[in-house]
C-alpha cells in the first residue's frame, strides 16, 4: 500500500521475448534481452515443449503486461513506465547463472536507467 505515484516501473519476464533482429534464446542462455516498451515487434524464443504460445499470440499482456503498466501510469498509480524492460529465458536447467550473474547485471542496468520498481512476470 505504498505510494508509487512518482516511481518508474519496469517489467522482467521469463517468456524469452526479444525484438526482431535480436539474438534468439538458446537452451542454456542465461542472458537477457532488452525490450523496448514502445516497439511492438516482440517474438518469443521459448523452446520448452511445455510453453503454450496461444496466449502470447492472442494478447502480449499474458507474458509482458506492458499495456497494464501503461494503464497504471495513466491512472497515476505509478509515476511512469520505463522504456527498458528485460526478458530472460525462464526454462533453464540451472538458474545459478541467472541468480549470480545476469540477474544482478540486469538489476544494475535498470537502476542505472532510473527504474524504482520491477514487476517480475514469470510464465
Name the predicted role of every residue range.
Residues 101-116:
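Short, well-structured alpha-helical segments in soluble
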Residues 46-52, 81-90:
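Gly-rich Lys/Arg/Thr-decorated short loops/hinges at beta-loop-alpha junctions or inter-strand turns
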Residues 65-81, 94:
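Redox- and metal-dependent alpha/beta enzyme cores, enriched for Fe-S-associated oxidoreductases
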Residues 12-66:
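Adenosine ribonucleotide-centric catalytic and binding domains
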Residues 1-8:
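Single conserved hydrophobic/aromatic residue that forms the stacking wall/gate
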Residues 83-105:
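Charged, often glycine-rich, active-site loop that binds/positions anionic groups
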